[in-house]
Amino acid sequence: MCDVVLGSQWGDEGKGKLVDVLCDEVDVCARCQGGNNAGHTIVVGDTKYDFHMLPSGLVNPKCLNLVGSGVVIHVPSLFEELENLEKKGLHCRDRLFISSRAHLVFDFHQRTDKLKEAELSENKKSIGTTGKGIGPTYSTKASRSGIRVHHLVSEEPESWEEFKTRYHRLVDSRFKRYGNFEYDTEAELAKYEKYRELLKGHVVDSIDFMHSAIAQNKKILVEGANALMLDIDFGTYPYVTSSATGIGGVCTGLGIPPKAINKVYGVVKAYTTRVGEGPFPTEQLNEAGKTLQDIGAEFGVTTGRKRRCGWLDLVVLKYSTLINGYTSLNITKLDVLDTFKEIQIGVSYTYKGEKLNSFPEDLHKLAKVDVEYVTLPGWEEDITKIKNYNDLPENAKKYLKYIEDYLNVPIQWVGTGPSRDSMLVKDLN
């Protein structure tokens, strides 16, 4: 059976840390969607490991790791990430497997991404993408013109010629759309001819890989990227990513049925952050927001951009819970709230005087909602050295209880600092 870790807000919740903790006891860790457009840091002892595309389970020497079919892969970045891990003493190539059905991100996808974003910026409609080529790659995938891993590594005699034909066709369509954007196609093809050999040893039929593990009763952990509010269908469209970031993306990205899923863990930052453009009802453009940003060190791992900050939004989390069906929650970065005398939580939206029953899909409507807050007393003490959930300040426990009661989902873990040891486990019995 598979347990799943998913982001419940707009990303950057701290999913990697929970995955790292859980991976001590699993046999397989799998990424199901996304690309290197998101990132997180795992701290083991005194060493920090930055992950973008690779599964976090690589830090566990006994864990096999799969990059699934729903992931889009920029091969140079994949090997760069591997090399950076190796420089820090983490040698894990023999435990990394890549789906033959995953689509490839090329440099021209990244170039296209930036050109498209520049066009939107001129009309003040920028999405705020990372420029990693993720959207253009999913676009070519949806239009059935994309290039998959098996096209690159196939041993069939005509496969390399077919790869080059597909590649030139994609590049030519970009030239027609954007003109000559100073792109060296032959240099990139030469680069991929070398990557072809490097990649071959990692490529597997991911359907067989996953279902063999399930049949052998292996413990499997699925690591979702991004978060529900960035989902292509259920997020704040169009200010979203280009993949299915919720529970549905687990099945489609790995080729497993819903009945193979056991637990679904929702990761929730104790407040709310967002990178890039898009609606953010509980955003605090004031001293509270600045304090959250400073104490929380809210800067993106992938882009270095400042994250927008605000109070916890339970309307968002209720919506996220309905879609993903969390069996329990991991509240992260609770310690960031240590200095606040009072803490606010968004509990409902009203629009033109009427209370809304769900998170609105219309962004014009969303921009006009009034957020109703409840104010809870802060605990105003350092919780970073606490090792037992029961030793948390009473006001901290009341804050967590309010979240549990509102969502009707138990909290199983509470993060109180950046290291893997700064994770309190709550007894659910």
Swiss-Prot record:
Q: Which cofactor does it need?
A: Mg(2+)
What is the protein named?
Adenylosuccinate synthetase
Query: Which reaction does this enzyme catalyse, per its entry?
Result: IMP + L-aspartate + GTP = N(6)-(1,2-dicarboxyethyl)-AMP + GDP + phosphate + 2 H(+)
Q: Which family does it belong to?
A: Belongs to the adenylosuccinate synthetase family.
Residues of the active site: 12, 40
Which EC number(s) does the record attach to this protein? 6.3.4.4
Which residues are involved in binding Mg(2+)? 12, 39
Question: Which residues does substrate bind?
Answer: 301-307
Please tell me the species this chain comes from: Debaryomyces hansenii (strain ATCC 36239 / CBS 767 / BCRC 21394 / JCM 1990 / NBRC 0083 / IGC 2968) (Yeast)
Q: Which InterPro entries match?
A: Adenylosuccin_syn_GTP-bd (IPR018220), Adenylosuccin_syn_Lys_AS (IPR033128), Adenylosuccinate_synth_dom1 (IPR042109), Adenylosuccinate_synth_dom2 (IPR042110), Adenylosuccinate_synth_dom3 (IPR042111), Adenylosuccinate_synthetase (IPR001114), P-loop_NTPase (IPR027417)
Q: Which pathway is recorded for this entry?
A: Purine metabolism; AMP biosynthesis via de novo pathway; AMP from IMP: step 1/2
Enumerate the GO terms in the molecular function aspect: adenylosuccinate synthase activity; GTP binding; magnesium ion binding
Q: What does this protein do?
A: Plays an important role in the de novo pathway and in the salvage pathway of purine nucleotide biosynthesis. Catalyzes the first committed step in the biosynthesis of AMP from IMP.
List the record's Gene Ontology CC terms alphabetically: cytoplasm
Q: How is the cofactor bound, as the UniProt entry phrases it? A: Binds 1 Mg(2+) ion per subunit.
UniProt-annotated binding residues for IMP: 12-15, 37-40, 130, 144, 226, 241, 305
Q: Which cysteines are joined by disulfide bonds?
A: none
- What HAMAP family does UniProt report for this protein, alphabetically? Adenylosucc_synth
Q: Where in the cell is it found?
A: Cytoplasm
> Which BP terms in the Gene Ontology apply to this protein?
'de novo' AMP biosynthetic process; IMP metabolic process
* Residue sites binding GTP per the record: 11-17, 39-41, 307, 333-335, 415-417
Keywords attached to this entry: Cytoplasm, GTP-binding, Ligase, Magnesium, Metal-binding, Nucleotide-binding, Purine biosynthesis
